[in-house]
Amino acid sequence: MKGEQQRVNVVAWLILGADFLMMLTALTLTLPPQSFALSVLAPHVAAAVLMAAFGPYLFAGVDWLLVIVLLIGHLWLMHLLVRRVRTFEVFGRWARLARRLALGAAVLLSLLACYYEFPVKEHYEFASSKVSGEPVRLAVISDLHSCSYGGRADPVLCDIAGLNADAVLLTGDIFDDRLSDDNAQNLVKRIVDIYPCFYVSGNHEYWSERIDEMKAWLRSVGVAVLEGECVTLSVKGTRIDICGVDDPTYMSDDQWLGQLKQADEQSDSSHLRILLTHRPERVSDYELFGFDLIFAGHAHGGQWRIPFTGRGGYAPDQYFFPRYVDGRYDLANGSVMLVSRGLARESTPLPRLFNSPEILVLDIGGR
């Protein structure tokens, strides 16, 4: 506990220092547009960084007093910034009102940044004539990147435990190439105690150069690791083929398509056929086969999402303004692809903005 407290204190001073430096930069700029923009956006970015760094400690209930003091300091810095930014002088007699509006906008954006750091459950529905019994519920976890959401009060686990799902699907980057495996292992072990669990690899797990070790551990706790394979599951009278392919990081195109073809051939077209993959951008490859459902991750929801548009700003391997980042996509061959925004927070180089971490939930009924 002492070591953990020391880490919290260090992070607190680092975040407060970064917050101060961003606002000091805004104060020293002379060009009105940049100065005004930073006066509003700097607190938002700082709040997002704050939540990314403190997320595990907030959920674990460690030193709430320190967090409250830090937030008070954050608000004080915002107030100081808005009072002193020279940009507002251009508004003449309306300068005071403009300052108040800017401060209100900064506070609102900061609160939104904090709100969007909490994980949510996104529910979808899908109808198929292959479902002959009661509806089937699947939960998808993607891109955890070994992040922590707390100990016993882990909201991710609590949400999953309360879903009454029939299976949990892990669509890659559950582990990270830089962080310890402990957080990911703790969550996976507790999920496996409740539900059948299926996994495919992600690019960061390959980058770690410990992919074989990770897969061996997953198998040892009862997770089905899919490498161009298919497992048949009987759920409430419905036969489901859960297929999966490895991330293509170190594969040739022929090897990648070979895994997809092998999974396709192992599955039964009379069953509900589901493909687990990490990469949503490989749509043209998926359209060569006839899977009913495809689950993917990797894009992190576009990392910085544009408010009210549902559009992401950037995703790996899709770059700026990516097409496949979140939600449902109907493919040309009739397949439906669902992309999870994932759960990564403190492990990402940039904080998530307007982009809640998510658990994807799909209810599949008959028609």
Residue ranges of model-derived segments:
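Hydrophobic alpha-helical segments, principally membrane-spanning helices and signal/leader peptides
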Residues: 102, 107, 128, 282-283
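Non-catalytic terminal accessory segments
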Residues: 1-119
